[in-house]
């Protein structure tokens, strides 16, 4: 009996996952693409519709006979919350079952390793969710942290941004009444980009420190020690600038957002304003930044042959500069005859 129940649960999970990734599908398409018999699909879909997980979303054009009903995920069936912890801020986002943002907020709150921080965060989250009509519909909370996280030991092994080592996540977890999942910030951002869409891709997190992540066959790859994707500590300029890790010439020292502000600007926004106003020093710094970023992208492209997604603070400003960056990248890849992979933001 247990085996039969487990098989049914697995079938339902596959159907739900398929519908979530294929909006407005049909029972016929589910049966065909998941290789599940039509009677099994009908039984499971009907039960999922009765429980409110799936809903009818319309009808397909008729080719004769009855019109097939299209089905999709019920967006309000459940919700999930994401929390982004940084050194000086907390970002919060509530999404529905279609990954559509219902609410978002960002609050200035300095991180502290003390237990009082956990209490303050709990109060902040409760306030954020106070207008949620059915709080029991919250599936769980995902918390992203800038640092190396050990899922087995349930701790932050090290975070330069938060200035912590071997920090237990138990107190944070106990601050909430729902399931809590912790993930490295770059890994979380990679998953948010829809790894099923990209299948094989690299994510570069261009924040005050340079992070990275990548997925293979639609699955996040963490490596043997959860350190995969530490692209910020690949040597970009041998013997170059000193990195906070102690080495010289790391990509972080050339491609992190902090290299643009560098004590002269209070924020990246102010730097970009100076750039748009034609400030010559800002223009020179930006040109150098793009040169270094192009080299890093080229190296990653040569090593992994994947799409590269540019995110983080700098990623938000790159839309108007992709042509210049693309030209710099192509100079490094000019000898490659096959079509190059995409660089996206």
Language-model-detected regions and their locations in the chain:
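Gly/Thr-rich phosphate-binding beta-strand-loop-beta motif of the actin/hexokinase/Hsp70
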Residues: 67-102, 203-205, 210-215
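Extreme N-terminal segment that seeds HTH/winged-HTH DNA-binding domains in transcriptional regulators
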Residues: 1-33
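Glycine-rich phosphate-binding loop and adjoining helix at the ATP-binding site
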Residues: 104-200, 319-331
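Glycine/GP-enriched mid-protein hinge/lid loop-to-helix segment characteristic of carbohydrate kinases
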Residues: 104-106, 170, 176-280
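Short glycine-rich, Thr/Ser-proximal phosphate-binding strand/loop in the N-terminal lobe
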Residues: 2, 84-116, 155-156
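Single conserved hydrophobic/aromatic residue that forms the stacking wall/gate
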Residues: 334-345
């Amino acid at each position: 009996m247990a085996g039969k129940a487990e098989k049914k649960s697995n079938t339902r999970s596959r159907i739900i996952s398929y519908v979530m990734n294929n909006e407005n599908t049909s029972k016929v398409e589910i049966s065909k693409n998941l290789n599940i018999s039509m009677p099994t699909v009908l039984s499971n879909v009907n039960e999922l519709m009765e429980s409110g997980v799936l809903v009818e979303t319309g009808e397909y054009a008729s080719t004769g006979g009855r019109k097939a009903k299209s089905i999709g995920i019920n967006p309000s069936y459940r919700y999930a919350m994401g929390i982004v912890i940084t050194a000086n801020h907390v970002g919060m986002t509530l999404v529905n079952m279609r990954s559509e943002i219902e609410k978002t907020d960002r609050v200035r709150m300095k991180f502290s390793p003390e237990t009082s921080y956990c209490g303050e965060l709990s109060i902040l989250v409760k306030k954020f969710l106070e207008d949620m009509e059915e709080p029991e519909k919250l599936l769980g909370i995902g918390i992203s942290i800038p640092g190396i996280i050990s899922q087995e030991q349930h701790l932050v092994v090290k975070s330069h941004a938060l200035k912590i080592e071997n920090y237990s996540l138990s107190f944070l977890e106990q601050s909430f009444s729902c399931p809590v999942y912790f993930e490295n910030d770059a890994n979380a951002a990679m998953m948010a980009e829809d790894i099923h869409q990209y299948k094989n891709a690299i994510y570069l997190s261009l924040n005050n420190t340079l992070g990275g992540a990548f997925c293979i066959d639609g699955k996040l790859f963490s490596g043997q020690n959860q350190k995969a994707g530490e692209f910020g500590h690949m040597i970009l300029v041998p013997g170059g600038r000193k990195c906070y890790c102690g080495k010289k010439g790391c990509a972080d020292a050339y491609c992190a957002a902090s290299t643009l502000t560098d004590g002269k600007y209070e924020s990246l926004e102010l730097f970009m304003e100076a750039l748009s106003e034609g400030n010559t020093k800002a223009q020179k710094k930006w040109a150098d930044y793009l040169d270094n970023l192009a080299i890093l992208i080229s190296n990653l492209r040569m090593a992994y042959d994947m799409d590269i997604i540019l995110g983080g603070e700098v990623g938000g400003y790159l839309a108007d500069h992709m042509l210049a960056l693309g030209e710099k990248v192509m100079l490094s890849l000019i000898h490659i005859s096959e079509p190059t992979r995409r660089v996206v933001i």
